[in-house]
Amino acid sequence: MEQEQDTPWTQSTEHINIQKKGNGQQTQRLEHLNSTQLTDHYLKIMSQADMHRQTVYWKQWLSLKNLTQGSLKTHVLKRWKLFSRQEWIN
């Protein structure tokens, strides 16, 4: 009988429950997440990815050579307005 291969999806959607026995050995049991846990997991992963994307964007933007205080202020205000608008929509 073939063993099912773990894919990134199954690895990310299954929770490994590790229990210690009385003799100190560890046992692992895979638990399939319910829909609420799966939704929470998805939101957490997407939030982390979005934060990483924003961080990379800001690092790239701040590394520009001709950065002036005025251009920085203008850019930050535009990004803040866009971010605030998205927060109200969500």
From Swiss-Prot:
Cellular component terms (Gene Ontology): host cell cytosol; host cell mitochondrial inner membrane; host cell nucleus; membrane
Presence of the UniProt keyword Membrane in the record: yes
Membrane-spanning residues: none
Region listing for Disordered, in residue ranges: 1-28
GO biological-process terms attached to the record: symbiont-mediated perturbation of host apoptosis; symbiont-mediated suppression of host cytoplasmic pattern recognition receptor signaling pathway via inhibition of MAVS activity
Localization in the cell: Host mitochondrion inner membrane; Host nucleus; Host cytoplasm, Host cytosol
Main subcellular location: host cell
Annotated spans, Mitochondrial targeting sequence: 65-87
Keywords tagged on the record: Apoptosis, Host cytoplasm, Host membrane, Host mitochondrion, Host mitochondrion inner membrane, Host nucleus, Host-virus interaction, Inhibition of host innate immune response by virus, Inhibition of host MAVS by virus, Inhibition of host RLR pathway by virus, Membrane, Modulation of host cell apoptosis by virus, Viral immunoevasion
Superkingdom per UniProt: Viruses
Assembly with partners or alone: Oligomer. Interacts with human SLC25A6/ANT3 and VDAC1. Interacts with host MAVS.
HAMAP family: INFV_PB1F2
Function in brief: Plays an important role in promoting lung pathology in both primary viral infection and secondary bacterial infection. Promotes alteration of mitochondrial morphology, dissipation of mitochondrial membrane potential, and cell death. Alternatively, inhibits the production of interferon in the infected cell at the level of host mitochondrial antiviral signaling MAVS. Its level of expression differs greatly depending on which cell type is infected, in a manner that is independent of the levels of expression of other viral proteins. Monocytic cells are more affected than epithelial cells.
Family: Belongs to the influenza viruses PB1-F2 family.
Extra remark: Is not encoded in all strains, and seems to be dispensable for replication.
Stated name of the protein: Protein PB1-F2
Top-level taxonomy: Viruses, Riboviria, Orthornavirae, Negarnaviricota, Polyploviricotina
Gene: PB1
